Curated annotation (Swiss-Prot):
This is Actin-associated protein FAM107A. PANTHER family: ACTIN-ASSOCIATED PROTEIN FAM107A, DOWN REGULATED IN RENAL CARCINOMA 1/TU3A. The gene is Fam107a. Residues 70-90 form a coiled coil. It is found in: Nucleus; Cytoplasm, Cytoskeleton, Stress fiber; Cell junction, Focal adhesion; Cell projection, Ruffle membrane. It comes from the Eukaryota.
Length: 144
């Protein structure tokens, strides 16, 4: 049986054309087998190595496939970008609204500092103001 296989191979080799470029000229560039760009890439090799190691360790059985993880990561990044764009759109409002906001903030600042001054005032001033209110209330009550 082994001899039959050898005979078939010999017949096949006889049918196949032999490359004649070897006999013509030794200066010609001889063709080489092309490399698969996917398998030749470093990232693909690292991914394959990582998958083999995880398979040997038994990891990844319950975890998500890499494609699903990448898709989720992209979706998450898209949501973050979308939120940032919405915030940027809110910031970049028309000039009229920006001016209204500035005026509103100025009015709030003008109203709030007197309250802040009262909070930071020494206690004897607060007591004195309380006494004035009491005395004015009692004088008004007397008038009634």
């Amino acid at each position: 049986m082994y001899s039959e296989i050898q005979r078939e191979r010999a017949d096949i080799e006889g049918l196949m054309a032999r490359p004649e470029y070897r006999e013509w000229n030794s200066e010609l560039i001889k063709p080489k087998k092309l490399l698969n760009p996917v398998k030749a890439s470093r990232s693909h090799q690292e991914l394959h190595r990582e998958l083999l190691m995880n398979h040997k360790r038994g990891l990844g059985m319950d975890s998500k496939p890499e494609l699903q993880r990448v898709l989720e990561h992209r979706r998450r990044n898209q949501l973050i970008k979308k939120k940032e764009e919405e915030l940027e759109a809110k910031r970049m409002q028309c000039p009229f609204k920006q001016e209204l906001l500035r005026r509103q903030q100025r009015l709030n600042q003008l109203e709030n500092p007197p309250q802040r001054d009262e909070d930071h005032a020494p206690e004897f001033i607060k007591v004195r103001e309380n006494l004035r209110r009491i005395t004015t209330l009692t004088s008004e009550e007397r008038a009634l």
